[in-house]
Design a protein with these regions (language model features):
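Short, surface-exposed "cap/lid" segments of acyl-processing enzymes
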Residues: 29-74
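Alpha/beta-hydrolase active-site loop
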Residues: 87-112
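Short alpha-helix in the alpha/beta-hydrolase fold that links the catalytic acid
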Residues: 51, 212, 225-235
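Acidic catalytic loop of the alpha/beta-hydrolase fold
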Residues: 221-225, 249
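N-terminal cap/lid segment of alpha/beta-hydrolase-fold proteins
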Residues: 1-31
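Short beta-strand/loop motif that positions the catalytic acidic residue
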Residues: 209-210, 216-218, 222
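Catalytic active-site module of serine/aspartate enzymes centered on a nucleophile-bearing elbow/loop
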Residues: 247, 251, 255-278
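Primarily recognizes the serine-hydrolase "nucleophile elbow" in alpha/beta-hydrolase
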Residues: 104-166
């Protein structure tokens, strides 16, 4: 296999922004101008499951791959896999995540000279796919989108109105993390932020504005994000390609992943993506 190199770095925070932990995997002989920036999903993180193996395979095929943890995903710089920072998790919202993508793209272009004129692609899994779509509608010069089991809207994923009323009354709502057994808090501001910015946080309108190519990869056995989401995304894409597989929401992968191979469905998606971007 061709050699790759990997470096970790932190995009420093400000008084108003938390730091973002990143890693960049690229071909050992770096000669291309292609970069995928990957957005993880809800309760996810950059080192989940097979994401490191996926980064390696893209780099082995000449495409650099950057993964990052959203600044408020609940991880920390020193403990990026579990969720020790529940305060940050509770303060997260969609607007913060879209801004995080903007910060990452800007940092890459300013700090890595060999990417200053790169073709930049956004890839997102599940909720991260929607964030990638919205970010692409900003003036970031994104070349293409790759959406993995992506949601097609956020509004329908909120609970029923009676639950929203309880959420508002209590100020916080808890969701279980089955992996860590934690009760993860969502402050009501998460919902209020969506309501206040609904027109901006609209995946359909964002995708219709995006003039580049979009690859939509989705499993027909996905129980977390129904396949109809993929059909929606495809219908809204100006240049859309749908890749349908008989697989689940994580394409046969899980966390932790202790194997040294990529599950078949995810490997097929990587191969399809490489072809799509060539």
């Amino acid at each position: 296999m061709p050699k790759t190199t990997k470096e970790k770095f932190v995009i420093q925070g400000t008084a108003y922004e938390k730091p973002i932990l990143c890693d960049l995997t690229k071909p050992f002989q770096h000669h291309d101008k292609n970069l995928i920036i990957f957005c993880h999903g809800y309760k996810g993180f950059k080192d989940w499951g097979c994401w490191n193996l996926m980064a390696d395979k893209f780099a082995q095929n000449g495409i650099s791959f950057l993964k990052f943890n959203f600044s408020h995903n609940g991880g920390t710089i020193n403990n990026p896999i579990d969720f020790p920072d529940l305060k940050a998790f509770s303060e997260n919202n969609y607007s913060i995540e879209v801004n995080d993508v903007t910060r990452v793209v800007s940092y890459v272009k300013n700090e890595f000279t060999y990417f200053s004129n790169a073709k930049i692609y956004l890839m997102g899994h599940s909720r991260g796919g929607g964030i990638a779509c919205i970010a692409s509608s900003r003036d970031l010069h994104i070349e293409s989108l790759i959406l993995l089991a992506s949601v097609s809207d956020y509004k329908s994923r909120f609970p029923e109105q009676c639950e929203i009323d309880k959420w508002k009354e209590n100020g916080v709502r808890y969701v279980e993390n089955k992996r860590t057994k934690q009760k993860l808090p969502h402050l009501y501001q998460f919902y209020q932020n969506y309501v206040d910015n609904e027109s901006i946080l609209n995946i359909e309108s964002s995708l219709k504005k995006f003039s580049g190519k979009t690859l939509i990869c989705h499993g027909t056995m996905d129980l977390a994000v129904d396949f109809q989401n993929a059909l929606n995304l495809c219908s809204w894409s100006n240049i859309g390609c749908l890749f349908k597989l008989r697989t689940n929401h994580t394409f046969g992968s899980k966390h932790p992943w202790n194997e040294n191979h990529i599950p078949t469905a995810l490997d097929q998606i990587i191969e399809k993506s490489i072809s799509f971007l060539s």
